[in-house]
UniProtKB/Swiss-Prot annotation:
Catalytic activity, EC: 3.5.4.30
Site (Important for bifunctional activity): G116, F117
Subunit structure: Homotrimer.
Pfam families given in the database record: DCD (PF22769)
Protein known as: dCTP deaminase, dUMP-forming
Catalysed reaction equations from the record: dCTP + 2 H2O = dUMP + NH4(+) + diphosphate
Superkingdom of source: Bacteria
Keyword Hydrolase: yes
Sequence segments annotated as region (Disordered): 161-190
Enzyme category, top tier: hydrolase
Amino acid sequence: MLLSDRDLRAEISAGRLGIDPFDDSLVQPSSVDVRLDCMFRVFNNTRYTHIDPAQRQDELTSVVEPTKGDPFVLHPGEFVLGSTLEIFSLPGDLAGRLEGKSSLGRLGLLTHSTAGFIDPGFSGHITLELSNVANLPITLWPGMKIGQLCILKLTSPSEHPYGSSGVGSKYQGQRGPTPSRSYQNFIRST
């Protein structure tokens, strides 16, 4: 069940759904707008010959923070990681679905590639997978509305929510745009 604006406010007021900082004007009819933080993670194209999900490649990306008051310019065909300004904390019976903003999509900005699902129990900044599919650069302003988070009520609480031991919650408590930790899940067949 998708939560309405009334249900979202009730969950926030009850302290079950955490959004920090919270701005009530960001609550939409069935979602909460999310804003862009000021840090970005860009790919260092000269450090590696290719990306290998099985390998830890610590220098594959580096953090870039625009000068205060300046935008980050995302060029055509570029892919960078960003994150939400807000920290989200979901209880064991609520999950989230991150979607882009229609107005930004019409400019060629994709907010996430594949990781739009937020597990119950997650707590942290949401990493954004930002792509410019337009043929002109797009300016990304820290603090701008960058997406919307829909909250879904589970039919029952999760038995092992994100963050539980043994679940492999690699991104619990993440701060800022967090690089891939796919190597932690990689199993080679022999």
